[in-house]
Amino acid sequence: MRKKWKMGGMKYIFSLLFFLLLEGGKTEQVKHSETYCMFQDKKYRVGERWHPYLEPYGLVYCVNCICSENGNVLCSRVRCPNVHCLSPVHIPHLCCPRCPDSLPPVNNKVTSKSCEYNGTTYQHGELFVAEGLFQNRQPNQCTQCSCSEGNVYCGLKTCPKLTCAFPVSVPDSCCRVCRGDGELSWEHSDGDIFRQPANREARHSYHRSHYDPPPSRQAGGLSRFPGARSHRGALMDSQQASGTIVQIVINNKHKHGQVCVSNGKTYSHGESWHPNLRAFGIVECVLCTCNVTKQECKKIHCPNRYPCKYPQKIDGKCCKVCPGKKAKELPGQSFDNKGYFCGEETMPVYESVFMEDGETTRKIALETERPPQVEVHVWTIRKGILQHFHIEKISKRMFEELPHFKLVTRTTLSQWKIFTEGEAQISQMCSSRVCRTELEDLVKVLYLERSEKGHC
């Protein structure tokens, strides 16, 4: 008979339930003396039941939790009854197998959001394996993902050391196991109750560094239960950490799987950030950029001389700045004192061209005041054919730290609109044929020129 929720044996089951113990229930008194239980940052009323959600595995339907009258959260494994048929059927979102003649009616109403990742649609609660998310994973590690309410949760899982020559794959886990090791299923476990103290509050973060996993994520590497201890600090030994999980959340904007993972957060291709080191905090003088799935970090070099006598250090910036520094003036363009051109407000335009390994990345950026941000249009071209095009919006503070950008002109919103409309046409046209000068010609639209008589 086919088993469900094969997770590597009793040790792993105990580990997941130990996570529930660490998570902690919390009593909260409100008006009318109502008692609530707090579990995973959610409130539950007395008597309310639910299945716990464990990333990256999704809802664990073979564990029931209930909020007791004294505010304790009690979780127990589901006891499955014996089935009296030859071919019991496993139903999605149910723990115990059923005989075909006792199946519940099909409900066509879908209440939960699906997820889209790398061109594939996954339903709420569905598990899958992702490749290429963690570039620094070890040979004994794999990436497990699950879909929950439209978001994709992925974890780096360290698989246990195998003692057999021919391991096999099992459902609902990216790790391979020895034949027979994964045969223990939730429904055949005893229905022990695991109590969670009401005065304990152990919240978990959705954006933790993979160098500092929370204790609840390390529960998978525990050797026994109860009496096992969690270990803080660096990742455990690869042979012991059979369930070490690093959680990242992938929003729907990462549909192509081109993301970088840093400090427990994900960044899209072309996105930049300052690294956050546990011992030093945010390192302002280092800038990292996501290049497809590889993060490239460079040190920011400050000028040796400044145009003012006493440059000032500003919090959040690497280099000193001159107080009251004015924007650069552009030769060949004349604007009035308020930065207007023919009565229309102008905004600075920046350009960056970077070439590496036969690939050209060209960026055009427009700085706006309302809202105060920079809109960056990124083109990646190889052998004259557009490989990738996307638009990202970043803060001015972040943009000032980006390398390779230079101020090329100032333009108006009307000219920028013409540029973006032409850009949309070129992005379709140049994705299937060679384009040599189309983008360069389009950029010229942003340059503002008066007629010889000075009329607008």
UniProtKB/Swiss-Prot annotation:
SUPFAM superfamilies: FnI-like domain (SSF57603). Residues 1-27 form the signal peptide. Glycans are attached at residues 118, 291. This is Chordin-like protein 1. GO terms for biological process: AMPA glutamate receptor clustering; BMP signaling pathway; cell differentiation; embryonic axis specification; excitatory chemical synaptic transmission; eye development; negative regulation of BMP signaling pathway; ossification. It is found in: Secreted. GO terms for molecular function: BMP binding; transforming growth factor beta binding. Residues 202-223 are annotated as: Disordered. Residues 35-100, 113-179, 258-323 form the VWFC domain. It comes from Homo sapiens (Human). Its main location: secreted. Gene3D superfamilies: 6.20.200.20, Complement Module, domain 1. SMART domains: VWC (SM00214). A motif (Cell attachment site) lies at residues 179-181. Keywords: Developmental protein, Differentiation, Disease variant, Glycoprotein, Neurogenesis, Osteogenesis, Repeat, Secreted, Signal. The gene is CHRDL1. PROSITE patterns: VWFC_1, VWFC_2. Expressed in the developing cornea and in the eye anterior segment in addition to the retina. Differentially expressed in the fetal brain. There is high expression in cerebellum and neocortex. Expressed in retinal pericytes.
